[in-house]
Amino acid sequence: MLVVIILVACYYLNAPRQDREQARSYTETVTSTNGRKISFEMAAIASGTFVMGSPKSEPGSKNDERPQHEVQVEPFYLCTTETTIELFLVYYQETTSTITEVTGDEQNSDDIDAITGPTPVYGDMTMGYPDKHPAMGMTWHNAKTFCEWLSKKTGRTYRLPTEAEWEYACRAGGGDIFCCGNDPNQLVDFAWYEADADGETHEVAQKKPNTWGLYDMPGNVREWVEDFYDPQGYSGDSGKGATVDSPKPADGKVHVARGGDFDSSAEELRSAARAFEEEWWRFGDPQIPKSRWWLPQMDCIGFRVARSIDSDSKIVKEQKHARK
Protein backbone atom coordinates (compact mmCIF):
# COMPACT_ATOMS: atom_id res chain seq x y z
CA MET A 1 0.00 0.00 0.00
CA LEU A 2 2.84 2.37 0.90
CA VAL A 3 4.47 1.69 -2.47
CA VAL A 4 1.25 2.59 -4.29
CA ILE A 5 0.95 5.86 -2.37
CA ILE A 6 4.56 6.76 -3.17
CA LEU A 7 4.09 5.97 -6.87
CA VAL A 8 0.93 8.09 -7.06
CA ALA A 9 2.67 10.97 -5.31
CA CYS A 10 5.66 10.75 -7.66
CA TYR A 11 3.37 10.78 -10.68
CA TYR A 12 1.59 13.88 -9.42
CA LEU A 13 4.79 15.75 -8.64
CA ASN A 14 6.29 14.94 -12.03
CA ALA A 15 3.16 15.45 -14.11
CA PRO A 16 3.20 18.31 -16.63
CA ARG A 17 2.35 21.62 -14.98
CA GLN A 18 -0.69 22.12 -17.16
CA ASP A 19 -2.11 18.79 -15.88
CA ARG A 20 -1.62 19.86 -12.26
CA GLU A 21 -2.92 23.36 -12.73
CA GLN A 22 -6.44 22.69 -13.85
CA ALA A 23 -7.81 25.42 -11.61
CA ARG A 24 -11.55 25.77 -11.55
CA SER A 25 -13.55 28.40 -13.37
CA TYR A 26 -15.71 30.65 -11.25
CA THR A 27 -18.49 33.20 -11.39
CA GLU A 28 -17.75 36.77 -10.35
CA THR A 29 -20.64 38.92 -9.16
CA VAL A 30 -20.55 42.70 -8.89
CA THR A 31 -23.17 44.59 -6.90
CA SER A 32 -23.87 48.16 -7.94
CA THR A 33 -24.57 50.92 -5.44
CA ASN A 34 -28.31 50.55 -6.10
CA GLY A 35 -28.17 46.82 -5.36
CA ARG A 36 -28.19 45.46 -8.90
CA LYS A 37 -26.13 42.27 -9.29
CA ILE A 38 -24.16 41.58 -12.47
CA SER A 39 -22.31 38.30 -12.95
CA PHE A 40 -19.73 37.08 -15.43
CA GLU A 41 -17.72 33.89 -15.90
CA MET A 42 -13.96 33.58 -15.51
CA ALA A 43 -12.45 30.56 -17.30
CA ALA A 44 -9.32 28.93 -15.89
CA ILE A 45 -6.66 28.66 -18.58
CA ALA A 46 -3.94 26.08 -17.92
CA SER A 47 -0.29 26.90 -18.47
CA GLY A 48 1.41 25.79 -21.66
CA THR A 49 3.72 26.63 -24.53
CA PHE A 50 2.50 27.68 -27.97
CA VAL A 51 3.83 29.10 -31.22
CA MET A 52 2.91 32.79 -31.46
CA GLY A 53 2.59 34.60 -34.76
CA SER A 54 2.03 33.35 -38.29
CA PRO A 55 4.13 31.89 -41.11
CA LYS A 56 4.62 33.93 -44.26
CA SER A 57 2.61 31.31 -46.14
CA GLU A 58 -0.54 31.99 -44.10
CA PRO A 59 -3.12 33.96 -46.13
CA GLY A 60 -3.26 37.49 -44.75
CA SER A 61 -0.07 37.16 -42.70
CA LYS A 62 1.68 40.47 -42.00
CA ASN A 63 5.29 41.32 -41.21
CA ASP A 64 4.53 42.25 -37.59
CA GLU A 65 3.34 38.67 -36.96
CA ARG A 66 6.76 37.26 -37.71
CA PRO A 67 8.99 35.54 -36.93
CA GLN A 68 6.97 32.87 -35.23
CA HIS A 69 8.31 32.05 -31.80
CA GLU A 70 7.50 29.86 -28.83
CA VAL A 71 6.02 31.47 -25.73
CA GLN A 72 5.50 29.88 -22.33
CA VAL A 73 2.29 31.11 -20.71
CA GLU A 74 1.60 30.76 -16.99
CA PRO A 75 -1.90 29.72 -15.85
CA PHE A 76 -4.43 32.53 -15.68
CA TYR A 77 -8.13 33.32 -15.72
CA LEU A 78 -9.84 34.97 -18.68
CA CYS A 79 -13.40 36.23 -18.86
CA THR A 80 -15.47 34.07 -21.17
CA THR A 81 -17.01 37.18 -22.74
CA GLU A 82 -16.13 40.72 -23.60
CA THR A 83 -16.95 43.27 -20.90
CA THR A 84 -20.58 44.23 -21.34
CA ILE A 85 -22.21 47.65 -21.42
CA GLU A 86 -24.20 46.59 -18.35
CA LEU A 87 -21.06 46.12 -16.23
CA PHE A 88 -19.15 49.04 -17.72
CA LEU A 89 -22.02 51.39 -16.88
CA VAL A 90 -21.72 50.48 -13.19
CA TYR A 91 -18.04 51.44 -13.30
CA TYR A 92 -18.84 54.64 -15.18
CA GLN A 93 -21.59 55.69 -12.80
CA GLU A 94 -19.52 54.98 -9.69
CA THR A 95 -16.28 56.64 -10.79
CA THR A 96 -16.98 59.23 -13.48
CA SER A 97 -15.42 62.63 -12.90
CA THR A 98 -17.65 65.69 -12.70
CA ILE A 99 -15.00 68.17 -13.81
CA THR A 100 -14.15 68.12 -17.50
CA GLU A 101 -10.84 66.66 -18.55
CA VAL A 102 -9.90 69.71 -20.60
CA THR A 103 -9.21 71.61 -17.38
CA GLY A 104 -6.68 68.97 -16.39
CA ASP A 105 -8.34 68.81 -12.98
CA GLU A 106 -10.28 65.61 -12.38
CA GLN A 107 -12.38 64.83 -9.36
CA ASN A 108 -11.86 61.57 -7.49
CA SER A 109 -14.85 59.42 -6.65
CA ASP A 110 -15.43 58.49 -3.01
CA ASP A 111 -17.37 55.37 -3.98
CA ILE A 112 -14.47 53.01 -4.67
CA ASP A 113 -11.45 54.14 -2.70
CA ALA A 114 -11.02 57.37 -4.64
CA ILE A 115 -10.36 55.90 -8.08
CA THR A 116 -10.15 58.68 -10.64
CA GLY A 117 -12.77 57.70 -13.18
CA PRO A 118 -13.47 58.80 -16.73
CA THR A 119 -14.71 62.24 -17.60
CA PRO A 120 -18.25 62.42 -19.02
CA VAL A 121 -18.35 60.87 -22.45
CA TYR A 122 -19.06 63.02 -25.51
CA GLY A 123 -22.35 61.60 -26.73
CA ASP A 124 -23.91 58.32 -25.62
CA MET A 125 -21.50 55.80 -24.10
CA THR A 126 -23.75 52.90 -25.10
CA MET A 127 -24.06 54.19 -28.69
CA GLY A 128 -27.65 52.96 -28.52
CA TYR A 129 -26.79 49.30 -27.92
CA PRO A 130 -28.49 47.13 -25.25
CA ASP A 131 -26.89 46.10 -21.93
CA LYS A 132 -25.65 42.67 -23.04
CA HIS A 133 -23.66 44.03 -25.98
CA PRO A 134 -19.94 44.61 -25.46
CA ALA A 135 -18.90 47.95 -24.00
CA MET A 136 -17.03 49.95 -26.61
CA GLY A 137 -15.41 53.25 -27.46
CA MET A 138 -13.07 53.40 -24.48
CA THR A 139 -9.34 54.08 -24.65
CA TRP A 140 -6.75 51.62 -23.34
CA HIS A 141 -6.32 53.89 -20.32
CA ASN A 142 -10.05 53.69 -19.60
CA ALA A 143 -10.02 49.89 -19.87
CA LYS A 144 -7.08 49.76 -17.45
CA THR A 145 -8.89 52.01 -14.98
CA PHE A 146 -11.92 49.73 -15.21
CA CYS A 147 -9.68 46.83 -14.16
CA GLU A 148 -8.46 48.86 -11.19
CA TRP A 149 -12.05 49.64 -10.19
CA LEU A 150 -13.10 45.99 -10.59
CA SER A 151 -10.16 44.87 -8.45
CA LYS A 152 -11.17 47.18 -5.61
CA LYS A 153 -14.83 46.29 -6.03
CA THR A 154 -14.25 42.53 -5.75
CA GLY A 155 -11.04 42.24 -3.73
CA ARG A 156 -9.40 40.25 -6.53
CA THR A 157 -6.79 41.62 -8.89
CA TYR A 158 -8.10 42.02 -12.43
CA ARG A 159 -6.12 43.24 -15.42
CA LEU A 160 -6.00 43.16 -19.20
CA PRO A 161 -4.56 39.99 -20.74
CA THR A 162 -1.13 40.16 -22.29
CA GLU A 163 -0.97 39.86 -26.05
CA ALA A 164 0.52 36.36 -25.74
CA GLU A 165 -2.16 35.26 -23.27
CA TRP A 166 -4.84 36.51 -25.63
CA GLU A 167 -3.48 34.62 -28.64
CA TYR A 168 -2.85 31.49 -26.57
CA ALA A 169 -6.44 31.52 -25.31
CA CYS A 170 -7.84 32.24 -28.77
CA ARG A 171 -5.95 29.30 -30.26
CA ALA A 172 -7.14 27.07 -27.39
CA GLY A 173 -4.33 24.58 -27.76
CA GLY A 174 -4.37 24.49 -31.55
CA GLY A 175 -2.13 25.90 -34.24
CA ASP A 176 -4.72 26.62 -36.91
CA ILE A 177 -5.27 29.91 -38.70
CA PHE A 178 -8.57 30.62 -36.94
CA CYS A 179 -9.97 29.67 -33.56
CA CYS A 180 -12.16 27.14 -35.36
CA GLY A 181 -9.66 25.61 -37.79
CA ASN A 182 -8.26 26.64 -41.16
CA ASP A 183 -11.51 27.05 -43.09
CA PRO A 184 -12.75 30.68 -43.06
CA ASN A 185 -16.24 29.43 -43.94
CA GLN A 186 -16.53 28.08 -40.39
CA LEU A 187 -16.10 31.54 -38.85
CA VAL A 188 -19.79 32.37 -39.20
CA ASP A 189 -20.49 29.90 -36.38
CA PHE A 190 -18.00 31.55 -34.02
CA ALA A 191 -17.74 35.24 -34.87
CA TRP A 192 -19.65 38.39 -35.72
CA TYR A 193 -17.79 39.95 -38.65
CA GLU A 194 -18.41 41.48 -42.06
CA ALA A 195 -20.12 38.34 -43.35
CA ASP A 196 -22.93 38.27 -40.81
CA ALA A 197 -22.87 41.21 -38.36
CA ASP A 198 -24.77 43.78 -40.47
CA GLY A 199 -22.30 46.47 -39.45
CA GLU A 200 -22.98 46.46 -35.71
CA THR A 201 -22.10 44.73 -32.46
CA HIS A 202 -24.18 41.89 -31.06
CA GLU A 203 -25.02 40.50 -27.64
CA VAL A 204 -22.06 38.58 -26.22
CA ALA A 205 -21.97 34.75 -26.15
CA GLN A 206 -24.48 34.21 -28.97
CA LYS A 207 -22.06 32.33 -31.22
CA LYS A 208 -20.22 29.09 -30.45
CA PRO A 209 -17.30 29.32 -28.00
CA ASN A 210 -13.86 27.97 -28.81
CA THR A 211 -12.80 24.67 -27.24
CA TRP A 212 -11.78 26.45 -24.02
CA GLY A 213 -15.22 27.96 -23.56
CA LEU A 214 -14.36 31.51 -24.67
CA TYR A 215 -16.89 33.48 -26.71
CA ASP A 216 -16.31 36.14 -29.37
CA MET A 217 -12.52 35.93 -29.30
CA PRO A 218 -12.63 36.78 -32.99
CA GLY A 219 -15.09 39.45 -34.06
CA ASN A 220 -17.77 41.58 -32.39
CA VAL A 221 -15.29 44.14 -30.97
CA ARG A 222 -11.52 44.34 -31.01
CA GLU A 223 -10.05 43.81 -27.57
CA TRP A 224 -7.40 45.86 -25.82
CA VAL A 225 -4.48 43.88 -24.41
CA GLU A 226 -1.78 44.97 -21.99
CA ASP A 227 1.08 45.32 -24.46
CA PHE A 228 2.45 48.31 -26.30
CA TYR A 229 2.75 47.79 -30.04
CA ASP A 230 6.11 47.19 -31.67
CA PRO A 231 6.15 46.08 -35.34
CA GLN A 232 9.49 44.34 -34.75
CA GLY A 233 8.52 43.06 -31.31
CA TYR A 234 8.71 39.39 -32.22
CA SER A 235 12.25 39.54 -33.60
CA GLY A 236 13.95 39.54 -30.21
CA ASP A 237 12.35 36.23 -29.21
CA SER A 238 13.27 34.27 -32.33
CA GLY A 239 15.64 31.34 -31.94
CA LYS A 240 15.74 31.46 -28.13
CA GLY A 241 13.43 28.55 -27.43
CA ALA A 242 10.29 29.16 -25.40
CA THR A 243 10.30 32.60 -23.79
CA VAL A 244 8.28 33.31 -20.66
CA ASP A 245 5.37 35.60 -21.43
CA SER A 246 5.52 39.21 -20.30
CA PRO A 247 4.08 42.41 -21.82
CA LYS A 248 6.37 43.61 -24.62
CA PRO A 249 7.83 46.09 -25.20
CA ALA A 250 8.16 47.63 -21.74
CA ASP A 251 7.07 51.04 -23.02
CA GLY A 252 5.78 52.72 -26.14
CA LYS A 253 3.16 55.10 -27.50
CA VAL A 254 0.30 52.93 -28.75
CA HIS A 255 -1.24 49.67 -27.60
CA VAL A 256 -2.36 46.48 -29.28
CA ALA A 257 -5.98 45.45 -29.89
CA ARG A 258 -6.72 41.85 -30.84
CA GLY A 259 -9.47 39.80 -32.42
CA GLY A 260 -10.96 41.94 -35.16
CA ASP A 261 -14.49 43.32 -34.99
CA PHE A 262 -17.96 43.21 -36.53
CA ASP A 263 -16.72 44.99 -39.65
CA SER A 264 -13.54 42.93 -40.12
CA SER A 265 -12.67 40.58 -42.94
CA ALA A 266 -11.93 36.91 -42.27
CA GLU A 267 -8.20 37.61 -42.56
CA GLU A 268 -8.45 40.12 -39.72
CA LEU A 269 -9.98 37.40 -37.53
CA ARG A 270 -6.94 35.15 -37.74
CA SER A 271 -5.60 34.17 -34.30
CA ALA A 272 -2.25 35.83 -35.07
CA ALA A 273 -3.67 39.08 -36.49
CA ARG A 274 -2.64 42.27 -34.68
CA ALA A 275 -4.13 45.77 -34.69
CA PHE A 276 -2.80 48.84 -32.95
CA GLU A 277 -4.10 52.24 -31.95
CA GLU A 278 -4.00 54.79 -34.77
CA GLU A 279 -4.45 58.55 -34.73
CA TRP A 280 -7.69 58.41 -36.73
CA TRP A 281 -9.32 56.43 -33.90
CA ARG A 282 -9.60 59.76 -32.04
CA PHE A 283 -11.04 61.82 -34.89
CA GLY A 284 -14.56 61.61 -33.47
CA ASP A 285 -13.50 63.44 -30.30
CA PRO A 286 -14.14 67.22 -30.58
CA GLN A 287 -12.06 68.04 -27.49
CA ILE A 288 -8.65 69.68 -27.63
CA PRO A 289 -6.60 68.06 -26.25
CA LYS A 290 -8.16 64.72 -27.11
CA SER A 291 -9.67 62.73 -24.26
CA ARG A 292 -7.54 60.04 -22.69
CA TRP A 293 -10.75 58.20 -21.78
CA TRP A 294 -12.90 57.94 -24.90
CA LEU A 295 -12.86 57.11 -28.61
CA PRO A 296 -16.38 58.46 -29.27
CA GLN A 297 -16.98 56.98 -32.71
CA MET A 298 -15.03 53.73 -32.28
CA ASP A 299 -17.85 51.32 -31.53
CA CYS A 300 -15.54 48.47 -32.53
CA ILE A 301 -13.09 48.68 -29.58
CA GLY A 302 -13.70 46.85 -26.30
CA PHE A 303 -11.89 44.46 -23.95
CA ARG A 304 -12.20 41.47 -21.64
CA VAL A 305 -10.59 41.06 -18.23
CA ALA A 306 -7.97 38.57 -17.03
CA ARG A 307 -6.51 37.50 -13.68
CA SER A 308 -3.37 35.71 -12.67
CA ILE A 309 -3.96 32.44 -10.83
CA ASP A 310 -2.59 32.92 -7.34
CA SER A 311 -3.27 32.40 -3.68
CA ASP A 312 -6.09 34.95 -3.49
CA SER A 313 -8.24 32.99 -5.92
CA LYS A 314 -11.88 32.67 -4.89
CA ILE A 315 -13.10 29.58 -6.71
CA VAL A 316 -16.82 28.91 -6.57
CA LYS A 317 -17.46 26.59 -9.51
CA GLU A 318 -15.72 23.58 -11.05
CA GLN A 319 -13.93 24.16 -14.33
CA LYS A 320 -16.46 23.68 -17.09
CA HIS A 321 -14.16 23.59 -20.12
CA ALA A 322 -11.66 20.81 -20.69
CA ARG A 323 -8.68 20.77 -22.97
CA LYS A 324 -9.54 18.71 -26.00
Language-model-detected regions and their locations in the chain:
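Short, well-ordered junction/capping motifs at the entry into regular secondary structure
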Residues: D189-P218, S246-P247
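Short, surface-exposed glycine/acidic/tryptophan-bearing loops
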Residues: P184-L187
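N-terminal pre-domain segments of enzymes
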Residues: A15-G35, I315
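Hydrophobic membrane-insertion alpha-helices, especially the h-region
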Residues: M1-A9
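Mature N-terminal segment immediately following signal peptide/propeptide cleavage
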Residues: K37-M52
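Active-site microenvironments of metalloenzymes and redox enzymes
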Residues: M52-P59, Q72-G181, E226-Y234, R307-K324
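Surface-exposed recognition segments
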Residues: E58-V71, G174-G175, A197-E200, P218-K324
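Short loop/turn microsegments at loop-to-beta-strand junctions
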Residues: F40, R156-T157, P209-W212
